[in-house]
Curated annotation (Swiss-Prot):
Species, as recorded: Staphylococcus aureus (strain bovine RF122 / ET3-1)
Transmembrane residue ranges: none
UniProt protein name: Peptide chain release factor 3
Function summary: Increases the formation of ribosomal termination complexes and stimulates activities of RF-1 and RF-2. It binds guanine nucleotides and has strong preference for UGA stop codons. It may interact directly with the ribosome. The stimulation of RF-1 and RF-2 is significantly reduced by GTP and GDP, but not by GMP.
GO molecular function terms listed in the Swiss-Prot or TrEMBL record: GTP binding; GTPase activity; translation release factor activity, codon nonspecific; translation release factor activity, codon specific
Gene Ontology terms: biological process: regulation of translational termination
Main localization, broad class: cytoplasm
InterPro entries attached to this UniProt entry: EF-G-like_DII, EFG_III/V, G_TR_CS, P-loop_NTPase, PrfC, RF3_C, RF3_dom_3_sf, RF3_GTP-bd
Gene: prfC
Entry GO CC: cytosol
Length: 520
């Protein structure tokens, strides 16, 4: 297989949803149908001691939520699929955002009873901004929920995107019989003891079956006829531009409708895309020269070894283990001899990868999120990955002063993962951490104790707003007021932490010569 054929066989996507919509369960079932795992786990089964394959961190297993982005690769038919199961909790939107920079499409999971929820909307907007094609899986049809037309209308009106139902449900909850596949005109029954049924071109059953007397079946056929009479053909170009989403109905927990979705996904999802550089050069996935970028760093994937993995998306060319690459930020060459693929916390050495693949590089502190690696004589760098402005700030210290070495190592590694941000006061060197949401601090405290054996003391600093400074040379000590704290971030850039919006406006009016700015 040549490079072009290899690249065309790659499909790389992230799954996005509001917490508890069934995102991690869908991930499990996709792995199950691909043969990548023999038994699909479930995040609900905590009493059994079985946890979802993609929820590998101890705190995730205890809470039943995803707080990191898991990366898994599996083969299906003639395709190699890279799937990223993203954090569903809103406090981890920063990690999710970076993950969405590394994929070519997204799968949006919606709970049929709840419809579009806040986190779904937030992540959808990120996909829309990037023009990422979105597939929709409406989940939990075996429970009572909103009617199909109501759900489609909600998607179209709330998200401003066209919908195209690929299948249609018969009933819901206790009366859920199955789904009608529009393309094959077949009925896939929900219960295993039922056989697949066939419809003719007029949507009449070709076999005798008691379902013909069922009101749910009659209603489903009437609704489907209305959809068909609308006459809109599936527009693949609209999908690829992010203007249309194909919609699938099913129940991930019951293994139903998942394979139907997976078969359609590999048919319609895009292959790896070209990427823009800072130099405004478009790098094609078919370019012979290797390139990639780091979008995530994860410490302690193996707690026994205190390792750290940098997740790299291959953009072009072929990666070969042992090859020499240049880290563009430092302009230093390095030989990559330790590279790995993932099934959550299970790792396997990677000798070869092409555009679209996600591989892990063992990191001794060389990499930062957003780093570009290139082979040959290439000199470009990919565009920076976005960073969020924190909204909660805490002073942090070790409870036991004898644990300072472990404390600082833990801080350094967890900050480099990008889930929490680091600041230091100018004169006292007091460490202040910033986060998008409170859960990040809870996870930070949990991981410091479990992974670094350090109990930490955290104290709110009474500041809610961070503003960076364009003209640092004009900052003086008199600008450090009772309503603000002047700190340095991990890159030694000056940052003001303000008490509230009023304090920020007061500062801007009193010192108009100082140009402040925020991140995302």
């Amino acid at each position: 297989m040549n490079l072009k054929q290899e690249v065309e066989s790659r499909k790389t996507f992230a799954i996005i949803s509001h917490p508890d919509a069934g995102k991690t369960t869908l991930t499990e079932k996709l792995l199950y149908f691909s043969g990548a795992i023999r038994e699909a786990g479930t995040v609900k089964g905590k009493k059994t001691g079985k946890f979802a394959t993609s929820d590998w961190m101890k705190v995730e297993q205890e809470r039943g939520i995803s707080v990191t982005s898991s990366v898994m690769q599996f083969d299906y038919d003639d395709y190699k699929i890279n799937i990223l199961d993203t954090p569903g909790h809103e406090d981890f939107s920063e990690d999710t955002y970076r993950t969405l920079m590394a994929v070519d499409s997204a799968v949006m999971v919606i709970d049929c009873a709840k419809g579009i929820e806040p986190q779904t909307l937030k992540l959808f907007k990120v996909c829309k901004m990037r023009g990422i094609p979105i597939f929709t899986f409406i989940n939990k049809l075996d429970r009572v929920g909103k009617e199909p037309f109501e759900l489609l209308d909600e998607i179209e009106e709330t998200l401003n995107i066209e919908t195209y139902p690929m299948n249609w449900p018969i009933g819901m909850g206790q009366s859920f019989f199955g789904i009608i596949d529009r393309k094959s005109k077949t009925i896939e029954p929900f219960r295993d003891e039922e056989n697949i049924l066939h419809l003719n071109d007029d949507f009449e059953l070709e076999e005798d079956h008691a379902i013909t007397n069922d009101s749910a079946f009659e209603q489903a056929i009437e609704e489907l006829m209305l959809v068909e009479e609308a006459g809109e053909a599936f527009d693949n170009d609209a999908l690829l531009s992010g203007d249309l989403t194909p919609v699938f109905f099913g129940s991930a927990l019951a293994n139903f409708g998942v394979q139907n979705f997976l078969n359609a996904y590999v048919d319609f999802a895009p292959m790896p895309n070209a990427r823009q550089t800072k130099e405004e050069v478009e790098v094609s996935p078919f370019d012979d020269s290797f390139s990639g970028f780091i979008f995530k760093i994860q410490a302690n994937m193996d707690p026994k070894h205190r390792d750290r993995i940098a997740f790299m998306r291959v953009v072009s060319g072929a990666f070969e283990r042992g090859m020499d690459v240049t880290l563009q930020r430092t302009n230093k060459k390095q030989k990559i001899t330790r590279s790995t693929s993932f099934m959550a916390d299970d790792k396997e050495t990677v000798n070869h990868a092409v555009a679209g693949d996600i591989i892990g590089l063992y990191d001794t502190g060389n990499y930062q999120i957003g780093d570009t690696l290139v082979g040959g004589k290439q000199t470009y760098s990919f565009q920076d990955l976005p960073q969020f402005t924190p909204e909660i700030f805490m002073k942090v210290s070790a409870k036991n002063v004898m644990k300072q070495k472990h404390f600082h190592k833990g801080i350094e590694q967890l900050v480099q993962e990008g889930a929490i941000q680091y600041y230091k006061t100018l004169h006292t060197n007091q460490i202040i951490l910033g986060a998008v949401g409170q859960l990040q601090f809870e996870v930070f405290e949990h991981r410091m104790k479990n992974e670094y054996n350090v109990d930490v003391v955290m104290e709110p600093v009474g500041r809610k707003i961070a503003r960076w400074i364009e003209n640092e040379d004009q900052i003086t000590d008199k600008m450090n007021t009772s309503r603000s704290i002047l700190v340095k971030d991990r890159y030694d850039d000056l940052v003001f932490l303000f008490e509230n919006e009023f304090a920020t406006r007061w500062f801007e009016e009193k010192f108009p010569e100082i140009k402040l700015y925020s991140l995302l």
